[in-house]
């Protein structure tokens, strides 16, 4: 009786055999708590925000009349706030709002996000205005993302290496479930409502983040014994990024992410040339959301213990080669094989989503395992911002290639060449796989320290860590303040 009284309500719910099964299998061994529920809720909301993905794409294409190159450039610039994640992380670590470092920023994120979608619904009428609101909405999601990242990293620091991947797979799943719920609706709603109405509906969901923030377990800054100092944080981060175990993998990931994307051009091809309707594109989103879960499951079950170099090398090669299957659709070779455009696109999207998900999971694990305690939000945000910068470059370079090759709203003669260039370019970083650690960098650092206790060396002894970034191939992927650009830059699928 005393034991039951000492348990939290949510823990009691997981005390029966069935609930224990759900804890071990559904929560992947993570202990249930209100804070975990809040974290999963925030990622779930970010998945739900995919409701507006197709609406934004069609709004920019049809109502604002942007060209493929212009859309790509606008989307890339709209993602610029994600480059500021270190600043946002530093602010959350050192500058509390209303007495809190995490809750208050989640409140701000939710309110800004809702306001941004309302502006889309009622105000935006030009490319310039769209760019400004994209920046604003992007900033709102970036704020929430860096905060929830820090919460997950703080929890992950307490986990053993044996459980690496479990929490990030769980949060991946939460976002994917949100995406699945709204995937089909994202296209179906456009059959019934205008894009602006869809934006107004989307404005409701960021408010759920505001509610979830109240479940975060956080001590008020007024009760803190030690106050974080910005200068001290910056010094710690600078010391960390100078270590080869952090710097070299970051350089590789940057080069890997910065290869060009052809997604905007391919979106125009599927809608203007192939005649894909919003309803069908919603179905594609539905099956790819499920495929994303399959990719996470495969990584969690079979691949999470593979060395970084092995999984990154093979997944990059396989993703690049499979991405070339898009040429079959572009050249209409599938029709000669008796396969309808819709069915081929659907099957191709499933395969490419699974491989893309598997390719990016080890990047997230590696990034999080490089985060020392005390500066989790700031350093992880710095690593993600480098990836985001590479993602912006990827889209901007892709837009330039689209323009140079003369791919427009109706001219797709050079689209096949564009897809070949973007896919094969993903192989360019492979000669630099040696920049990645051969094994777990934390284990290696610890071993070296034990062998040379008096030698400070140039490495940090880092604690176990893992984290979720709800991105697939491309650091900006699946950011649902915009169309899902970047997730398929190697595949260039819709």
From Swiss-Prot:
Any one GO CC term of the record: plasma membrane
Subcellular location: Cell membrane
InterPro entries assigned to the protein according to its UniProt record, in alphabetical order: BT1, FBT, MFS_trans_sf
Effect of residue 93 to C: Affects 5-formyltetrahydrofolate transporter activity
Transmembrane segments: 31-51, 64-84, 104-124, 133-153, 170-190, 197-217, 246-266, 284-303, 310-330, 346-366, 375-395, 415-435
Effect of residue 348 to C: Affects 5-formyltetrahydrofolate transporter activity
Impact after mutating residue 82 to C: Affects 5-formyltetrahydrofolate transporter activity
Protein family per UniProt: Belongs to the major facilitator superfamily. Folate-biopterin transporter (TC 2.A.71) family.
Protein's UniProt name: Folate-biopterin transporter
